[in-house]
Amino acid sequence: MLPERVLEILREMKRERIKGASWLAKKGAEAFLTLAEELDESLLEDAIMELREEVVKVNPSMASLYNLARFIPVTNRRDILKSRALEFLRRMEEAKRELASIGAQLIDDGDVIITHSFSSTVLEIIRTAKERKKRFKVILTESSPDYEGLHLARELEFSGIEFEVITDAQMGLFCREASIAIVGADMITKDGYVVNKAGTYLLALACHENAIPFYVAAETYKFHPTLKSGDVMLMERDLIRGNVRIRNVLFDVTPWKYVRGIITELGIVIPPRDIQ
């Protein structure tokens, strides 16, 4: 049985509706740090194995959780567990900084960026471009039904970045005004497909039809080493509106052929050539 403090972190991860793969991976690493603080070393190995399973179960569509679980060794030493969890967090922050620097190079003065959902990685790219004195505008979808786009809008407003919020249904219309699309990712599959908030596929199709370059921002810890697109389990959380059940699949899968490139901390990779 995992300690109550660890279980509470897992519950917090499961409750979260807005923040994405990076936030969940960070909370997962914090769960392992808490485990190191709470348990006697004689109980540690079994608890680590249990927590590795539970972390992945929080959201099987997020490769960051799978890779975190793989990164943490089964050990009876608290110092090793703590060291590995901290190292994962350090690598996460370093990767985001490097990726943001690379991604900001894609943004030119006068650009109109279109995005979907909330990605802390995409936000970091946009902020970095702003710090480099580039002038641009962001079009963002409200991203229903959880409205992650409104969270992004607040962050952009705080950073003094011009933006416009649209309904999801208008992404095909407004992408014509964009010069570049950048979205985040919850997983890049082994065969180069992009798993992200439902609606990402539609935006990619609209951009393809209108010759708008479509980029995905994903640190390498969001790349799944074994899972292919046909094996992805997409979570579903149905809604009830006026006594009517509405299907609500949380994620979709975008084929690599619609992706101009994947921005990583190691550079821009072209799927599936650079992933296989």
Swiss-Prot record:
Tell whether Protein biosynthesis is among the UniProt keywords. Answer: yes
Q: List the disulfide bonds.
A: none
Function (record text): Catalyzes the exchange of initiation factor 2-bound GDP for GTP.
Q: How does it assemble?
A: Complex of two different subunits.
Task: List UniProt keywords, sorted A-Z.
Answer: Initiation factor, Protein biosynthesis
Name the family the entry cites.
Belongs to the eIF-2B alpha/beta/delta subunits family.
Q: Which organism is it from?
A: Pyrococcus horikoshii (strain ATCC 700860 / DSM 12428 / JCM 9974 / NBRC 100139 / OT-3)
> What's the protein called, per UniProt?
Putative translation initiation factor eIF-2B subunit 2-like
Give this protein's Gene Ontology molecular function annotations.
guanyl-nucleotide exchange factor activity; translation initiation factor activity
NCBIfam families assigned: PRK08335.1
Enumerate the SUPFAM superfamilies for this protein: NagB/RpiA/CoA transferase-like
**Keyword field contains Protein biosynthesis:** yes
Q: Which InterPro entries match?
A: eIF2B_alpha/beta/delta (IPR051501), IF-2B-related (IPR000649), IF_2B-like_C (IPR042529), M1Pi_N (IPR027363), NagB/RpiA_transferase-like (IPR037171)
